[in-house]
């Protein structure tokens, strides 16, 4: 098949997901193009597909847009696969334009069911968009009833896919930069975009008890802020935990990410709500147990007492005890590391590509065995 992915954001989880899936689909005999934003963070990493940097949130790029249109006319995609939920108006505009250029079937992976910043028109826009998609891919079973209820998507047009390690290429191609951490520290890492729904304030509230029981613990909160972090900084100062809890409010490089994940003993995801997490999949890829809340489909990935611990959201006391337990119980931790590595090995991009390919075949009417012969 000839497949055109559109993932406008050039950085973070959605485009990393698309990069991995695109490579795996090429391995299965398909021809793939990824259209993304200017400043594509994976531009210098090995890839097997064509990448076009078209979108720019700061200024128009008419020449790049013309190249994109020309590529669509010459490539003649059979599948156009939209990725991400942050730009519904853009997706509708692209749908309206691209459907005039050929006969491609449109499919959609929202990643997040709703955007980080929900605006008044978004629900209507998504209803319009979903109604025009031939198939929808989700990354957590819990999201299926939400999409059916809010956007009237028929159940038989939905496929739930797992998420494999988004950043496996980091371990293959990047030398990690070790963070400045005291050698004896037991590092608890909370990684990813900093948003109100991520429950960072709950983690900070849990920190004093963790540090009381495990004096050599070090909590690292690393990620680009999508919120005002002044309240978090005040909370940290009021608790008097500077130096023992570090807030690193920036989007870090892949080398820095590798350093943080390697240094961590465990990952903690204290979300209050959500849809899925690429950070969780990356944690498993690095062999790290995860403490997560029972939201966002996390309980579909984390097996309680086996690959991590599940806790209720917004409960600092329970979160603190879970962190303490994994920091102090070395036997439990060792068992979990083994289980995490086994779980990570069972979810591959090849498997996800095969499942995706089967739905593509259904959509274009050529069945599941649609590689190679239809890609020419």
Cite the ranges covered by each PLM segment.
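Acidic anion/phosphate-binding donor-loop and adjacent secondary structure
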Residues: 30, 148-149, 162-181, 259, ...
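Nucleotide-activated donor-binding/catalytic signature segment of Leloir-type glycosyltransferases, i.e.
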Residues: 232-251, 255
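Acidic donor-binding loop of glycosyltransferase active sites
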Residues: 259-275, 288
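Conserved acidic donor-binding segment of nucleotide-sugar-dependent glycosyltransferases
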Residues: 304-305, 309-316, 325-331
């Amino acid at each position: 098949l000839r497949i055109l992915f559109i993932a406008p954001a050039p950085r973070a989880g959605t485009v990393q997901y698309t990069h991995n899936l695109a490579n795996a689909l090429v391995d299965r005999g398909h021809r793939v193009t990824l259209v993304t934003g200017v400043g594509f963070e994976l531009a210098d990493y090995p890839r097997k597909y064509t990448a076009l940097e078209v979108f720019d949130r700061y200024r128009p790029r008419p020449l790049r847009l013309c190249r994109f249109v020309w590529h669509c006319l010459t490539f003649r995609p059979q599948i156009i696969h939209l990725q991400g939920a942050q730009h519904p108006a853009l997706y509708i505009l692209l749908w309206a334009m691209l459907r005039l250029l050929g006969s491609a079937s449109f499919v959609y992976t929202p990643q997040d069911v709703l955007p980080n910043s929900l605006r008044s028109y978004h629900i209507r826009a998504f209803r319009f968009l979903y109604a025009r998609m031939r198939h929808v891919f989700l990354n957590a079973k819990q999201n299926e009833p939400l999409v059916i209820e809010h956007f009237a998507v028929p159940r038989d047009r939905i496929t739930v896919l797992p998420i494999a390690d988004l950043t496996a290429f980091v371990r293959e191609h990047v030398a990690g930069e070790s963070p400045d951490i005291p050698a004896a520290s037991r590092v608890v890492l909370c990684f990813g975009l900093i948003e109100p729904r991520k429950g960072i304030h709950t983690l900070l509230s849990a920190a004093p008890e963790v540090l009381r029981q495990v004096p050599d613990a070090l909590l690292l909160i690393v990620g680009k802020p999508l919120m005002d972090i002044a309240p978090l900084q005040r909370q940290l100062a009021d608790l008097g935990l500077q130096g023992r809890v570090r807030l690193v409010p920036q989007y870090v490089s892949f080398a820095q990410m590798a350093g943080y994940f390697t240094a961590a003993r465990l990952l903690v995801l204290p979300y209050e709500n959500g849809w899925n997490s690429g950070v969780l999949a990356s944690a498993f890829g690095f062999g790290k147990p995860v403490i997560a809340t029972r939201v966002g489909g996390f309980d579909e990935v984390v097996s309680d007492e086996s690959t991590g611990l599940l806790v209720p959201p917004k409960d600092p006391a329970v979160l603190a005890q879970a962190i303490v337990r994994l920091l102090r119980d070395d036997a439990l931790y060792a068992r979990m590391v083994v289980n995490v590595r086994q779980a990570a090995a069972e979810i591959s991009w090849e498997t996800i590509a095969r499942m995706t390919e089967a739905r593509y075949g259904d959509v274009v009417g050529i069945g599941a065995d649609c590689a190679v012969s239809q890609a020419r």
